[in-house]
Curated annotation (Swiss-Prot):
The keyword Lipid biosynthesis does not apply. GO terms for biological process: antimicrobial humoral immune response mediated by antimicrobial peptide; biological process involved in interaction with host; defense response to Gram-positive bacterium; detection of bacterium; innate immune response; killing of cells of another organism; negative regulation of natural killer cell differentiation involved in immune response; negative regulation of type II interferon production. Monomer. Homodimer; disulfide-linked. Heterodimer with PGLYRP4; disulfide-linked. This is Peptidoglycan recognition protein 3. Keywords: Antibiotic, Antimicrobial, Disulfide bond, Glycoprotein, Immunity, Innate immunity, Repeat, Secreted, Signal. Residues 270-275 are annotated as: Interaction with murein.
Length: 347
């Protein structure tokens, strides 16, 4: 369970640490993935450094006070994220135990899965193991050391923004500016899945419709598999369907990530009569009987909100299922039952 900084005992502790200078910090003790017994890292989407954001959260209900127990907790967390949520690894870049040690998550160079819209521009740090609901002085000190280390070594911008604040508007270390009101989800670019170069007609923007689709093939839960799935889809659409490019504007994996198809500015090939006026968003997989997971649904909704905010989609858009405008099973009944509850849906 993740919580924000609203615990009544947290403020006095944090205020004490605000008096400390980051210049006085030392190097953190980092327990490596090998040391805590991590399963193989399968998240491979790189993080562009230094990142401008720092996200700090807390994992509750799992206590530990020493490295052996805390390592076991981190292994359990990794297993939960991979097997229950279908993600490619543990959600955070680093975790800080109540024993005062830092545990390597996906590390410095790989995107985490902690905060939709910020995974590609932030370091995600999570406290865990506390008995009383707020981090121990040792954990707070270790986090301060970790932040200082990240800045000194070029992983975190010296002018970083910390979006999540205390209700009293105090945070672990001074924040530097306001959080933007809305942030777009991380979109894995065409270059990451090694897209073939194409030259297709331009989109008529802003789009007036959103059409939700499923690919009807296999789903993917890990970024490496999703990258292959998108690349294979493009090849099938070009070589077998004689399309100009991959049919969809964007694809969403069960890893909770959005993958760029033809993108915002190019016509899709997903729905006859709508390709130049509708954004086609495809969930990778078959969702006739079972719906997509929560992470992928949130990613798609965030993408739609982003499209409106960026001017790619009109604010009074209509959202439809693929089957509403084509004689086809897509997006599958299980997914259709969900999207018909979304804003702007029109049967």
């Amino acid at each position: 369970m993740l919580v924000s900084w609203d615990h009544p005992k947290m403020l006095p502790r944090l205020l004490g640490f605000l008096a400390l200078s980051l210049l006085a910090c030392g190097n953190p003790t980092i327990v490596s993935r090998k040391e805590w017994g991590a399963s193989s890292l399968t998240c491979r989407v790189p993080l562009s450094l230094p990142v401008p954001y720092l996200i700090i959260e807390q994992v509750t209900r799992m206590q530990c006070q020493d490295q052996i127990t805390c390592s076991q907790v981190v292994r359990v967390l990794q297993s939960q994220y991979v097997h229950n949520k279908g993600w490619c690894d543990i959600a955070f870049n680093f975790l800080v135990g109540d024993d005062g040690k830092v545990y390597e998550g996906v590390g410095w160079y790989v995107q985490g899965l902690h905060t939709q819209g910020y995974n590609n521009v932030s370091l995600g740090i999570a406290f865990f193991g506390s008995k009383i609901g707020s981090p121990s002085p040792a954990a707070l000190s270790a986090t301060e050391d970790l932040i200082f280390f990240a800045i000194q070594n070029g992983y975190l911008s010296p002018k970083y923004i910390q979006p999540f604040l205390l209700k009293e508007e105090t945070c672990l270390v001074p924040q530097h500016s306001e959080i933007p009101k809305k942030a777009c989800p991380n979109i894995t670019p065409r270059s990451a899945w090694e897209a073939r170069e194409t030259h297709c007609p331009q989109m008529n923007l802003p789009a007036k419709f959103v059409i939700i689709i499923h690919t009807a093939g296999k789903s993917c839960n890990e970024s490496a598999d999703c990258l292959v799935r998108v690349r294979d889809t493009q090849s099938f659409h070009i070589d077998n369907q004689d399309f100009c490019d991959i049919a969809y504007h964007f694809l969403v994996g069960q890893d909770g990530e959005v993958y760029e198809g033809v993108g915002w500015n190019i016509e899709g090939s997903h729905t006859y009569g709508y390709n130049d006026i509708a954004l086609g968003i495809a969930f990778m997989g078959n969702f006739v009987e079972k719906p997509p997971n929560e992470a992928s649904l949130k990613a798609a909704q965030s993408l739609i909100q982003c499209a409106v905010a960026k001017g790619y989609l009109t604010s009074n858009y209509l959202l439809m299922g693929h089957s509403d405008v084509s004689n086809i099973l897509s997006p599958g009944q299980a997914l259709y039952n969900i999207i018909k509850t979304w804003p702007h849906f029109k049967h």
